[in-house]
């Protein structure tokens, strides 16, 4: 009978230690997840900006990087010089 009480006490102590260490580890992991979530939402809102405000061309065309403004419309994005 005394052995089962000791086993229960040891298990209870082990559970208590695990719960205390999990409480100190989890906040840093949740902080990292919230940082990633804010980066994702910032990227999503940046994708909703109007075309007139975007100066950078599509990355599908690696030759063109920025509009050169040679057509007197600096934000048209049709002609570029690298």
Swiss-Prot record:
It is found in: Secreted. The keyword Lipid metabolism does not apply. PANTHER family: HEPCIDIN. Keywords: Antibiotic, Antimicrobial, Cleavage on pair of basic residues, Disulfide bond, Hormone, Secreted, Signal. Its main location: secreted. This is Hepcidin. One of its GO terms (molecular function) is hormone activity. GO terms for biological process: defense response to bacterium; intracellular iron ion homeostasis; multicellular organismal-level iron ion homeostasis; negative regulation of intestinal absorption; negative regulation of iron export across plasma membrane; negative regulation of iron ion transmembrane transport; positive regulation of proteasomal ubiquitin-dependent protein catabolic process; response to iron ion. The keyword Hydrolase does not apply. Pfam families: Hepcidin. GO terms for cellular component: extracellular space. Liver-produced hormone that constitutes the main circulating regulator of iron absorption and distribution across tissues. Acts by promoting endocytosis and degradation of ferroportin/SLC40A1, leading to the retention of iron in iron-exporting cells and decreased flow of iron into plasma. Controls the major flows of iron into plasma: absorption of dietary iron in the intestine, recycling of iron by macrophages, which phagocytose old erythrocytes and other cells, and mobilization of stored iron from hepatocytes. Has strong antimicrobial activity against E.coli ML35P N.cinerea and weaker against S.epidermidis, S.aureus and group b streptococcus bacteria. Active against the fungus C.albicans. No activity against P.aeruginosa. Interacts with SLC40A1; this interaction promotes SLC40A1 rapid ubiquitination. Residues 24-53 form a propeptide. Belongs to the hepcidin family. Residues 1-23 form the signal peptide. Disulfide bonds join 64-80, 67-70, 68-76, 71-79.
